[in-house]
């Protein structure tokens, strides 16, 4: 099992003005590859997948090591995200690579995931990538 721990923030969805309106994702190139992650329609004034992510779905961006976890595995596996502060745990879909190293954070989560965990930007999360736990739906 791969485990990392550190600070987090939120990203994606129509309200994320920290990403350009036409910004894509690192390993998902079309809505058809992971339709469960996206809003039904593209938000007005945008064309990129980052702003089309559904903020109510639990998704996560981490600096995935593609040698350890291939893109194919990322698209078929959920990770476990735990907040030591609130003691809450969720499962989340890998959706992107990030955050940038300069942020000092290890993960970016959807707004919905952060809300379910009861955390805010720069709170600590523990992220676990279980071996062999693939999505069944």
What kind of feature is each model-predicted range?
Residues 1-137:
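Secreted/periplasmic proteins
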